[in-house]
Design a protein with these regions (language model features):
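Repeat-blade elements of multi-bladed beta-propeller folds
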Residues: 1-30, 45, 49-79, 92, ...
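Short, surface-exposed beta-strand-loop junctions and turns on beta-sheet-rich folds
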Residues: 10-11, 75, 129, 171, ...
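A short beta-strand motif characteristic of beta-propeller blades
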Residues: 40-49, 87-98, 128-134, 171-176
């Protein structure tokens, strides 16, 4: 299946450009599921979001029969929908962890049966909080993840050292010898982690 959110606001059709600054973009929203082979619509559900101070970022992710919609205005909002029917299963919101260096626009991470939306991890099935106390990080330092591990740059970002947070045993390990960037240069897959150097062009100190 292919999932997406679309706006059916008729006023958008008269916009002179595809760069839409109008708050109408967030009106008449629908969550849609298509058959990936035929393009046939499987279901389409009207959804509502908090569009006060219209969203800064807007993400849709899928795992374990859940569609996770995450967005921010002056707070983080997390809505989980059934991928089978499109019905809402649970909804959460919480304040930003900080108001600088991208603290208002982190993307969600789905790790195992949890979705991490800073600074909490919610269980996919029911929205119960399963992770608190996410690593304190400096700079922009957003996180990426593999099946059971979260990768990030710690508070000592002037050294640029990467850390691994194993969610199975809650251990956090320092890995020295490479400097990743604050904004998603750690990519994992097939038992490996790819970390191209990111020491150039970053305004953070690099000894």
């Amino acid at each position: 299946r292919v999932y997406f959110v679309e706006s059916n606001s008729s006023s958008l059709r008269n916009q002179p450009t595809s760069r839409i600054a109008s708050n109408n973009l967030w009106s008449s929203l629908r969550l849609v599921a298509l058959n990936q082979n035929t393009g046939v619509k499987i279901w389409s559900k009207a959804i509502n979001i908090n569009k006060s101070n219209y969203p800064v970022v807007f993400f849709l992710a899928y795992a374990k029969s859940r569609l996770v919609l995450s967005y921010t205005t002056n707070r983080y909002y997390v809505d989980a929908y059934s991928s089978v029917s499109g019905s809402k299963v649970w909804s959460k919101n919480h304040s930003w962890n900080r108001d600088h260096h991208g603290g208002h626009m982190y993307h969600p991470l789905i790790v195992g049966d949890a979705v991490i939306v800073e600074p909490y991890g919610y269980k996919l099935s029911n929205g119960v909080v399963v992770h608190r106390g996410l690593p304190a990080r400096g700079g922009c330092s957003t996180m990426s993840a593999s099946k059971n591990t979260v990768h990030y740059i710690n508070w000592d970002y002037d050294k640029g050292s990467m850390y691994f947070w194993d969610l199975n045993d809650n251990r956090r390990r320092l890995m020295v010898g490479s400097r990743s960037s604050c904004w998603l240069s750690l990519i994992s897959g097939n038992g490996m982690i790819l970390s191209p150097t990111a020491s150039s062009g970053c305004r953070c100190r690099y000894p």
